[in-house]
Amino acid sequence: FKTMDLSKNLQKFIMKIPRNGCVFICNPNNPTGVLIQKAEIVKIIAAAKKKSTIVFVDETFIELVPESDESVIKQIKNFENLFILRSLTKSFGLAGIRIGYGVGSPQIIGPLQKIKIPWNVSNIAQHAASAAICYHPFLDKTCKLIKKEKNFISSNLAKSKKFTCYNSTTNFLLVKTKTKSKLLQK
């Protein structure tokens, strides 16, 4: 996981952007929890635009990053090749409902509408999502609780010599175990 930091490989990444293709970026990354800086993603989007390539940015966990302004959702107005994916299931605890949304230019949304799955989100899911997004105190409270609990877990894992816990900006931790895999499989 030493090369997970895109800032160290940004130019190499940009050089590999395909012409007339698409690029998927998960920010924060899953499973590492590494948050890519907004400026770096904007450079990728701009480079992709020159190659007529669409950039999909999965921001499923971005709302669970405390005090962050690294979302590129406001860049939609500047780049017609950008599409943002968001989920309400993670940030608002609606995992059983499985609901999210996408934001992008008409040039991207139009073709996506033609190939979308034939069924829409249920009424129950729509009402639950509407209620959840209107209740901002829940998200603020959740972020504070996650930060506290994540610090507790990571500090206790760090005390053990059997685990390496990687820094994460979001609500999950990537943990490397020093225990042999055969023992873990038992």
What feature does the model see in each segment?
Residues 1-4, 85:
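Hydrophobic residues at beta-strand termini and immediately following loops
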Residues 4-66:
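Active-site phosphate-binding strand-loop segment of PLP-dependent enzymes
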Residues 81-159, 163-166:
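PLP-dependent aminotransferase class I/II
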Residues 40-51, 71-78, 111:
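Catalytic-core regions built around general acid/base machinery
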Residues 147, 157-186:
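Conserved PLP-binding catalytic core of the aspartate aminotransferase-like
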